[in-house]
């Protein structure tokens, strides 16, 4: 079974999310791992996709949208949401979960739960501190880019409109969807 974690961020540095996703990090020090020349080291294996943006220009796309709608200007505003879906390490062997399949599940999850948002979806194979559990990171701009049809979990009429902020809905909805992730 998968576990869902949510982190809200007030940082306006959207590029930091991409850097964390594609480069190796020292989890204890919370810093990038550098080679002997001082360059960041790419992760050994990851899958990366963007929704409503190109993944490698996520930061610029989010900043542009924020300027367009004049949102996310206050330092105390939540500017992005980071969701992590962690699979049990046994899912790799018992359910034949692969990085590719986890990425597909992450994309499905992001499209269903964060429609209209710019998002990065990235699967890591290594797990926290080398635990080996496959996990998917979903980082969304808190500002919705596109109008979308109203979903049953959207609590306010504006929750489906472009230019409005992500409203963290009842986690009951997200957790219900989390348990419905079909591995095979």
Residue positions per predicted region:
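N-terminal nicking endonuclease/strand-transfer module with a His-rich metal-binding environment
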Residues: 1-175, 180, 184
């Amino acid at each position: 079974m998968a576990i869902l974690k949510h982190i809200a961020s007030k940082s306006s540095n959207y590029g930091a999310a991409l850097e964390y996703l594609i480069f190796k990090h020292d989890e204890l020090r919370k810093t990038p791992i550098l080679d002997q020349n001082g360059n960041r080291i790419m992760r050994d294996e990851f899958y990366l996709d963007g929704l409503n943006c190109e993944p490698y220009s996520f930061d610029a796309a989010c900043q542009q949208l924020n300027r367009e709608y004049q949102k996310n200007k206050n330092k105390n505003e939540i500017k992005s949401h980071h969701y992590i879906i962690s699979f049990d390490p046994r899912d790799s062997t018992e359910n034949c979960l692969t990085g590719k399949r986890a990425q597909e599940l992450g994309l499905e999850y992001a499209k269903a739960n964060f429609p209209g948002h710019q998002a990065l979806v990235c699967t890591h194979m290594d797990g926290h501190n080398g635990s080996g559990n496959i996990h998917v990171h979903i980082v969304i701009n808190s500002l919705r880019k596109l109008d979308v049809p109203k979903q049953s979990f959207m609590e306010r009429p504006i929750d489906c409109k472009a230019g409005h902020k992500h409203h963290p809905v009842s986690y009951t909805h997200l957790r219900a969807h989390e348990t419905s992730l079909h591995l095979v």
